[in-house]
Amino acid sequence: AMKFQNPRYINKMGDKEYMKYLPNGEDKSARYGTPRIKTPKEMIDYVHKQNAHIMISVWASFGPWTEMYQKMDSLKALLQFDTWPNNAGVRPYDPYNPVARDLYWSEMKKNIFDLGMDGWWLDSTEPDHMNLKDQDFNTLTYLGTFRRVHNAFPLMSNKGVYEHQRATTSDKRVFLLTRSSFLGQQRYASHSWS
């Protein structure tokens, strides 16, 4: 936020306001100690005080060590093929499943949106598909085989976030940045990049 507002500000390493947000800023040591920003809420508030907005990258996949993986797995809402990071057992969720979209948003809302987050960078919405095998496309989704519906993955994932945020509040504009798109996806406030 500071660099965007004034490109030379970032060079003011002695500035006490800037230094307090760097790890070990007081002694400029190379090792990292306790971060200056202690909580995500403090970081979001700091960016807002700089008259800027903040967005966060959110992936459509979960590792087996996470609570979300367990919840999605109990719904049979994980697609059974490898995604990023490779060879870690991480699986994309099934955005075609409305209950899975509800769960995905409930965690985003509780852990991120309620803190004041302004936008979403929805990454891996193709989704990333590692160790690709033809039979992976026979994986069942809520709407049938992945082969039949895989191109609509970004549409459904973006739809879920957009509709849930709009249902949560009309006081904050939805902004989604995504690297994957599908026809008509712009209606969900999706902006594609590549």
Where are these regions (language model features)?
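Catalytic-domain carbohydrate-binding cleft regions of carbohydrate-active enzymes
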Residues: 1-194
